[in-house]
Regions:
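Structure-specific nucleic-acid interaction/processing domains
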Residues: 2-36, 40-117
Length: 117
């Protein structure tokens, strides 16, 4: 298979499935605190963390993490995918966002509030 055909295949697969939506946690390995969030595209969260690690900048991260990221560095944060939302083709963006908000709230309840940003 040539490169162009492979690229077309990958693009078609992406369009069929769309990005992976879900709930994640960024854990500060130095302080033990964590940030629980949700995203329509978990890949973008991974990319933002990688960018912050490579550049040493903190602006790619959530503003609640900036102080600790400046103090300990972005490399002190680990990404954990807590749950991937099964997105059905008939779901609207609003339904996906509502489901993500519910899942995020359920996951937040599992952690000690004093250890969550």
């Amino acid at each position: 298979m040539d490169q162009k055909a492979r690229r077309r295949e990958l693009v078609a697969e992406y369009r069929r499935t769309g990005p992976e939506a879900g709930v994640y946690r960024l854990v500060n390995t130095k302080s033990g605190r964590s940030f629980v969030g949700s995203a329509l595209n978990l890949g973008s969260v991974r990319s933002k963390l990688e960018f912050a690690r490579k550049t040493g900048g903190v602006s790619a991260l959530d503003h609640k993490l900036w102080a600790d990221a400046r103090q300990h560095g972005a490399e002190s944060f680990d990404l954990e995918i807590l749950e991937v939302l099964e997105v059905r083709p008939e779901m609207t963006q609003e339904e996906i966002r509502a489901d993500l908000a519910t899942l995020e709230a359920l996951w937040r309840e599992r952690y000690d509030p004093s250890q969550v940003y």
